[in-house]
Amino acid sequence: SILLSIIGMLTGAVVDTIGIRKTLLISIFFLLFSRFFMSFVTNPALIFVLGFIPMAIGFAVVGPLVSIAIKKYTTKETAAMGFGLFYVLMNLGYAIGSMLFDKIRGFFSVTDAAGVVNENAGTMLFGLHFTTYQMVFVIGFGFTIISLIVAFFIRDHIEINDEGELVKTPKKELGSGLESVKNSAIDVATMLKNVVVEKTFWIYIGILALTLFVRCVFFHFSYTFPKYGISVLGEGAPIGNIYGFLNSVLIIFAVPIVSYITKKTSSYKMMIIGSVVSSLACFIAVIPPSFFEGLTNTPLGELVFIKWLNLVDSPEKMSGITAVSEYWPLIFFIFIFTIGESIWSPRLMQFTAEIAPKGKEGTYIALSILPWFAAKFFVGPMSGLLIKIYTPFENGHPLPASPDHAMIWFWIGAMALLTPVTLFCFGKFFMRKLSVESEK
């Protein structure tokens, strides 16, 4: 995670130097390389070197790269919809990935005579045994090949001006072979050096730092929520569907509507409104499950447990679902959080691109990871501490959860609330400073 941030901070300057298409192809190459070896290799040291490191490089490049491309290929009028559409497509990918993850786990799992589920049983392929999680990477490798083919058709060195006209941008002459690599490295270093001494850049970083508190909830969804879900709902619970699918599908429908309705509202104001909604949503998970018990044996309960999560095949069996009432606070929490996310998250991406000076978009957008990089040194240990206190594990299996396990989301929600509070309190100060610097 930290490696992702370090590489991502360098990506923008690379894009500004060699262009979008070449940078994207480099990224996809690293992802192909990592997914190939993670499909076959089982040695932890080799997985780290041949899998995790190239995967971190590939992923780190993609995020800033897409934001830079949207900035170059949209006008001021279409930027909100452009970033909104990207956010929709990204979450469509998450939704498909979440469904595939749970489907693959279920398809390749084995249940013994005692009813114990082994999720990682796997299968034989090409005369070799692949575990369930190796099969995830085999399938991912196939999808990445499709991405590589599509990337070859991208046009480079063009952008759209504010009048909506297609403009060709000059291609930088970097020489050939080793000289090209050397000149690219020099240009990247020069770009980074020039940007980090600008006052505008540090004001920009200050604003982004205030958004960290609510953005850290995403980190907890990735690292804290899976263990929380397994501990509270039981092993084999469809935790990928509960967050990954529900969140992504809602985003797909909500973001275009919100983007269109609010396209003339400032990004900063939308960030405040959306972060309030998302922050307060965390506290829904703290509500006692007994409050929602009446919803289980209703048409909504049938929709959730039979049609969506596929936990049982008939209404009569719903009361037998392990920790059935515990699902409801989490579902409503994620639902409301996602509504807030659809308001603030795409606009944060747009705000990041709006502030970046022309010609330095890539460097600014990539270096916007800097506060997020610093936050990981705090939020990672926070996640580990919360899990240890409220939902402990031993040898990869959950121990009995604390009766106060929902307090995990109280502390996460309290942290998230700092974002709208600080954005509101310091907004005028930062905007005034940005205005002064832009006039110089």
Regions found by a protein language model. Give the residues of each.
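Loop-to-transmembrane helix entry
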Residues: 1-2, 225-250, 273, 324-332, ...
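Conserved MFS/SLC helix-loop-helix module at the cytosolic interface between two early adjacent transmembrane helices
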Residues: 6-42
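Helix-to-loop junctions at the C-terminal end of transmembrane segments
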Residues: 7-20, 105, 253-273, 387
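Intracellular juxtamembrane helix-capping segments at the cytosolic ends
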Residues: 61-75, 229, 342-357
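Intracellular loop-helix junctions on the cytosolic face of multi-pass helical membrane proteins
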Residues: 76-80, 101-226, 230-236, 254, ...
